[in-house]
Curated annotation (Swiss-Prot):
Major location (coarse): cytoplasm
Family to which this protein belongs: Belongs to the prokaryotic pantothenate kinase family.
First-level EC class: transferase
EC numbers for this chain: 2.7.1.33
Keyword ATP-binding appears in the UniProt entry: yes
Organism: Shewanella sp. (strain W3-18-1)
Lineage of the species this protein comes from: Bacteria, Pseudomonadati, Pseudomonadota, Gammaproteobacteria, Alteromonadales
GO biological process: coenzyme A biosynthetic process
Protein name, entry field: Pantothenate kinase
One of the record's GO cellular component terms: cytoplasm
Length: 316
């Protein structure tokens, strides 16, 4: 996967799994198997060895980068003769549906908050910034859910701008995967974290590839370090179908679930519906909007079979 892409060869240093794991440099493992169980997503197989080989070196890299940014901030404050200004370091995590962005974000949050330089690490997903279900239906965007135009980008940019500017309390809307909708009158409060992890499909997008107004700022303008979780599309489709089957047995069985009508499908019926959703919505969104932003990331995590990381690509 890595050797066939000339752009990646030009822009990135490529590490095989074993090479990357050596960069851990004795960073202690602070997660137990029980901790990891709480962090895993549906159909995710991330193990303690995956944490040790991939995520501990990454947390060490991010710690060094954040410390450097903090030290630079102190130098600027001294030069300008002003009181220290607290601006959260913002990490974005992008990638396709079913690639495991959420698990990556949760594991990184758990590891990064153990470093003394940045103990307060918040995690926000962009799902909450999807337009409410009623608005999507009214705009004719229900079959485009997850595409850039299905997000309230003005609200998302205002949120990330407020966090970056050091606002003491900033509200983020909460999304329910049961009702398939934004939760009314409930918010996540972000209160001046040391690090904010922002996870979502389109967080690497810029005005170059936006189908909407390009004159306004984009989320990527506020991000300090960006990560793209990558995999071949054939694997992504397979993982999406497997996850759909898991949801059918779990979340879809809830009578309140928007997808409750899928709960009694046979395996063959569920696989066919999941494949169609991929081919008509998730696949085109990946090809048109998500994958083209991949080479903007500072770091690419490449997955192979069984969700295992095979390579790490780091910007030169």
């Amino acid at each position: 996967m890595t050797s066939k892409n000339p752009i990646q060869k030009a822009l990135y240093l490529t590490f095989e799994r074993a090479q990357w794991s050596e960069l851990r440099d004795s960073v202690p493992l602070t997660l137990s198997e029980r901790d990891l169980e709480n962090l895993r997503g549906i159909n995710e197989k991330v193990s303690l060895s995956e944490v040790t080989d991939i995520y501990l070196p990454l947390s060490r890299l991010l710690n060094l980068i954040v410390k450097s940014k903090q030290q630079r901030g102190l130098v600027l404050d001294e030069f300008l003769g002003q009181k220290p200004f607290h601006s959260p370091y913002i990490i974005s995590i992008a990638g396709s549906v079913a690639v495991g962005k959420s698990t990556t974000a949760r594991v990184l949050q758990a590891l990064l908050q153990h470093w003394p330089e940045h103990p307060k690490v918040d995690l926000v997903t962009t799902d909450g910034f999807l337009y409410p279900l009623a608005d999507l239906k009214r705009k004719g965007l229900l079959q485009r859910k997850g595409f850039p135009e299905s997000y309230d980008m003005k609200m998302l940019v205002e949120f990330i701008s407020a966090v970056k500017s050091g606002q003491p309390h900033t509200k983020a809307p909460i999304y329910s995967h049961v009702t398939y909708d934004r939760v009314r009158n409930q918010h996540q409060i972000v209160s001046q974290p040391d690090i904010l992890i922002l996870e979502g499909l389109n967080v690497l997008q810029t005005g170059l590839d936006s189908p909407v107004d390009t004159r306004r700022p984009f989320v990527s303008d506020f991000v300090d370090f960006s990560i793209y979780v990558d995999a071949e599309e054939s694997l992504l489709k397979q993982w999406y179908q497997e996850r759909f089957l898991q949801f059918r047995k779990g979340a879809f069985s809830d009578a309140k679930s928007y997808f409750h009508h899928y709960a009694n499908l046979t395996d063959d019926e569920a696989n066919a519906i999941a494949a169609n959703i991929w081919d008509t919505i998730n696949g085109p969104n990946l090809q048109l909007n998500i994958q083209p932003t991949r080479e903007r990331a500072h770091l690419i995590l490449q997955k192979g079979q069984d969700h295992l990381m095979s390579h790490v690509l780091m910007r030169k």
